[in-house]
Structures are given as C-alpha cells and as structure tokens.
Amino acid sequence: MATNFLMHEKIWFDKFKYDDAERRFYEQMNGPVTAGSRQENGASVILRDIARARENIQKSLAGSSGPGASSGPGGDHSDLIVRIASLEVENQNLRGVVQDLQQAISKLEVRLSTLEKSSPTHRATAPQTQHVSPMRQVEPPAKKGATPAEDDEDNDIDLFGSDEEEEDKEAARLREERLRQYAEKKAKKPTLVAKSSILLDVKPWDDETDMAQLETCVRSIQLDGLVWGASKLVPVGYGIRKLQIQCVVEDDKVGTDLLEEEITKFEEHVQSVDIAAFNKI
C-alpha cells in the first residue's frame, strides 16, 4: 500500500525537484530566456548537480557509519569524487565563458554608444528635384543671301589645298622607301640551312679488294651540299674489312638515296652501302 501511495505522490521530498519546478515557473512568468541567462542557468544546474552529489555522498557516508551498515566498495566513492571534480572543472569553464560574454557585450555597448554620438543627429535630406521644362527645338537662323563679293572670296579659298596632296605624296614615298629597305635587309640575312651528319658502312666483295682504291672512289663523288669527313677500316671477319666514312650533307640538296646510288656505281669494289648513324645538325 505504501508503495502504491508513493507512485501517485503530489509532493516532493527532494529539494532539487522543488528548485526545478520553481525555476520553470519563474521562467514562464518572465518570458523567453536570453543567451546570457541560459549560460547562468546551465551553471546553476551544474551547481545543483554538485550539491546533489555531495548530499548523496553524505547520505552514503552516514549510512555506512551506522551500526548495522556494512563497509561498501571504495570504487563508488572514488567515482563520485571524480565526477565532482569534473563538474567543478566544467563549472569553472562555464564561469569563464560567461565572463567573456559579459565583456564582449560591454565592449559592444561602448562601441554602439560611441557610434551613436559620432553620427549626425539629423538625416541628410534628399536633394530636391528641380522641374525641368521640355526642351524646345531651336530653329537655326535664316541664312542671308550671300553677296557677290562674298561668293568671290569663298571661291578663292581652297578647302582641301595642295599642301595635303604634297603630304600624301611624301608619306607614300617614305612608305615605299621603308619597304624597300626592309626587303633588302631580309635578303641579306643568311638563311638557316638544315644539315645532317651521316656515317656510312661501305662493304667490299672479298678480302682481296683494294680498300685504298675503294676509299678513293668514294671520295671522288662530289655533289653540291656534300662534304666528306674522317674514315677508317673496320674488320668484319675472315680477313674482310669494311670502310666506315663520315659525311655532312645539306638536306635540301643531297639525300641518302642519291648518296647510296652514287657509291654503288663502283660495282667492282663496292658490294653494298649501309647507313650506320644519322644525326641532324
């Protein structure tokens, strides 16, 4: 019966319930809560939690010190102490936040007051619009009839003049002169010639071929844009040696096909011609 009665109780035995009910009542009476009051309410809630925790600790200590009480585990008390310490730290942090907010609000109030003092008391009046009358079309003055003497004077004036014609001729002459000088300068400028360095392998028929005579035959080829370079004999095998000769050619004048064709004309000494290396200069 006692348990059923406590389930439907309409009074509070704990003080914090009464405090919460009283706080909600006054908040409803005073209207919406500002940001600063919310911070203070949060701090007060933490303070009430701390007080409640202390009250519970005191009750537990009082119950454990009684005659029939048994010694409980020490871990519960340590947890409560840790929670109290954390709540106190949070309380200090909230107090610091509240102080910072109060300082910021005071600074804003000071700045607002200075701005209000520096601003002009009267508003700038809008400029009055002036009534503009519609534009009237101005008629040009009537031309007077020109006298014969004035007509003669007008005829004597050369509006275009011969000076402008002379200036046009001078400008055309200068333009032609500059174009001619530019063309001469461009013609004198040396043009870049694309050249290539080629290393040829000239192979004889057998080891009895006179390699000196073969080199003489190859160097006897004279073409526009062809310059022969160094040469040497490279052994191939079985006593046979090939002629390795270097040359520089102009790409527009001498091609590799033409060079091979001219060398292979010496059929008695030359078996074949191969390009060992080809580099652009």
Curated annotation (Swiss-Prot):
Modified residues (N-acetylalanine): A2
Modified residues (Phosphoserine): S37, S44, S60, S86, S106, S119, S133, S162
Name of the molecule in the record: Elongation factor 1-delta
Family under the similarity heading: Belongs to the EF-1-beta/EF-1-delta family.
GO biological process: cellular response to ionizing radiation; translational elongation
Keywords: Acetylation, DNA-binding, Elongation factor, Nucleus, Phosphoprotein, Protein biosynthesis, Transcription, Transcription regulation
InterPro entries found in the cross-reference section: eEF-1beta-like_sf (IPR036219), EF-1_beta_acid_region_euk (IPR018940), EF1B_bsu/dsu (IPR049720), EF1B_bsu/dsu_GNE (IPR014038), Transl_elong_EF1B/ribsomal_bS6 (IPR014717), Transl_elong_EF1B_B/D_CS (IPR001326)
GO molecular function, one term: translation elongation factor activity
Source organism (scientific name): Rattus norvegicus (Rat)
